[in-house]
Amino acid sequence: VPFLSYSRYKEALKAECFRHLITARDVLKHEIWNYFNDRYGDIDVLSRNPVIAKGFTRLSGAFHAYGIDGPQFQKIRSIYQPLMEYYVADYGYANIFFIERDGSVIFSALREDFSGTDLFIGEYKDHHIAHIFKLALEDVSFEDYSWNDKVNDFTAYFAAPVFEAESLLGVIVIELPFSHLDTILTHKAGLGKTGEMYLVGEDGLMRSNSRFSVTPTILQKEVDTEATRDAFEGYVGAKIINGFRDMPVLSAYTPLNLNFINWALLVEMDEAEAFVAIQKAESLLKVIASVIGTITIGYIYFTRRAYKKAEEEHDILESEEQSEA
């Protein structure tokens, strides 16, 4: 019965470890959903704002008439600069860009990175911002993270077309720093010394930084495990696998299921740490079993010895009685 009770206790502890990781996974998934859906909402609202459409029209007219360095253009730019700077500061963007439908970058909120260039034929025609611009001419679009020397961070883009009535004016782009997503993912409370949360893109590369690496792992570390393969096939689950550090881990995984992102989310902890309570219980059980075994052997030994002594004494008494007779 005690061993049966321990077996049930062991299974209950394992189930509790997995429940903890699954809860962390589901909470994190919700937070990531909220972050990206909020940014999707931001770009959608900005693109529909009449003030933005008016800004496109006025900036475009001045740009083509006087050039980006002309005082007339700079005067109109100064009207929209404070508003865009507010959006950047308040929402934590890296930048906001206005791009005409012909590919001319006519506004940059914080820096002049691409201003005045042509994203169809200019020096940045193969840049990520050119790619997102071309996609966003049709609909709201997302461009995955890539390294940006200007801000010394990985950045991603959301972009949407801007219309005035039925006429396409161009595309508005918001640039997102990776630091926001990294803050969400580096939450370690309740995950012990070896637990971590991380994202993997469909190209197999991490979209986050591992707590076990002193150098960035985003877009550098390749992860191909049973859990990531399951997640990219659409499965949600939790199991013990061989992790990307080549050791057994408890892994709770899920696809993100965002329309514009095909990533896998994983929450993991080393099996050795997760089952430490079980290991302690097993060690204690071994000690108890050893003590019980020693006591049992001692009991049998002394019982047999006492029984043998009693038999010897009985034989002596019997012999004495026969002699007296």
What is the role of each PLM region?
Residues 1-11, 285-301:
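Extreme N-terminal signal-anchor transmembrane helix of membrane signaling/transducer proteins, especially
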Residues 1-78, 85-96, 141, 154-158, ...:
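Juxtamembrane extracytoplasmic/periplasmic/luminal helical "stalk" adjacent to the first N-terminal
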Residues 79-81, 85-175, 238, 242-244:
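Extracytoplasmic/periplasmic ligand-binding sensor regions of membrane-associated signaling proteins
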Residues 20-27, 45, 190-191, 287, ...:
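PAS/LOV and related PAS-like sensory modules
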Residues 10-13, 131, 181-185, 269-289:
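Membrane-interface helix-start motif
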Residues 38-53, 85-105, 140, 186-206, ...:
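Short N-terminal helix-loop-first-beta-strand/juxtamembrane motif that initiates sensory/input modules
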Residues 11-19, 304-325:
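Cytosolic signal-transmission helices at domain junctions
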Residues 162-170, 190, 198-203, 211-286:
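Extracellular/periplasmic juxtamembrane segments that couple receptor/chemosensory ectodomains to their
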